[in-house]
């Protein structure tokens, strides 16, 4: 069978469906999962990323989980390199890789074999200094002056991506988008299945998920990660849920501040889900399944049908 990728917005049930689909195969083929959720790369970031515990993985090998310390910076280029090596190794063992996750750039960099523009430390440092001196809003305005399309695609609060875009524009003399790949045949001839559901249903699922995260001990998890150096982590400290709890703890960590963190975490997940929907629905290669109108068994059947027919 061809490799499979399961994508879609956060909270839609990608991890569980992947396990159900693999179990339904009943051992006909050997299957291994490759994670494509950027924040699940981090050790200790379990509750807030809805990472499946080892006991819940049903004995199925998982890759790209718990491979970074929270002080390390996650990058698309590094993920692409190591995840691609995992997929090649899985295939070499005669097994089938299943990519599962919703981190948009991570998924596309892997399936479309992106090439990344070079970097110049001196240029990068200069733009980082500008960021520190003038702030992200003014630096984002400078990006808009140089490359309006790039500025429109990058949130005005995202200093790291703004710096990278300015670096690429300066080094290449071309718009940032010129270095992005065009969508073609997916790498390894991967079959891509997308999961989605009505927005109201997903919002309810997200509300339950956030309540569960806080109920299971997200705040204590953040306190533990602070001892591991979370504040020094460029990407880990900005993860949804973790950033909001950090803000609440900095403000004193009382019940009101933690309630605000919970609400902001929920709203952040809703915004992120909208962005994921928009991103993945632009990809004509995705076979979409509605998980809100079909029962779990039916969705598994549909996913298997798509996978087998494509193979």
UniProtKB/Swiss-Prot annotation:
Q: Name one Pfam family in it.
A: IPPT
Q: Name one GO biological process term.
A: tRNA modification
Keyword list (alphabetical) reads: ATP-binding, Magnesium, Nucleotide-binding, Transferase, tRNA processing
Q: Where is this site: Interaction with substrate tRNA?
A: 103, 124
Q: List positions binding substrate.
A: 10-15
Q: Which domain of life is it from?
A: Bacteria
Recorded catalytic reaction(s): these are: adenosine(37) in tRNA + dimethylallyl diphosphate = N(6)-dimethylallyladenosine(37) in tRNA + diphosphate
Per its record, what are the GO molecular function terms?
Answer: ATP binding; tRNA dimethylallyltransferase activity
Binding of ATP occurs at 8-15
| NCBIfam families cross-referenced by the UniProt entry | miaA (TIGR00174)
**Family as reported in the entry's similarity comment:** Belongs to the IPP transferase family.
Q: What does this protein do?
A: Catalyzes the transfer of a dimethylallyl group onto the adenine at position 37 in tRNAs that read codons beginning with uridine, leading to the formation of N6-(dimethylallyl)adenosine (i(6)A).
Q: How does it assemble?
A: Monomer.
Q: What is this protein called?
A: tRNA dimethylallyltransferase
Native organism is: Mycobacterium leprae (strain TN)
Gene label: miaA
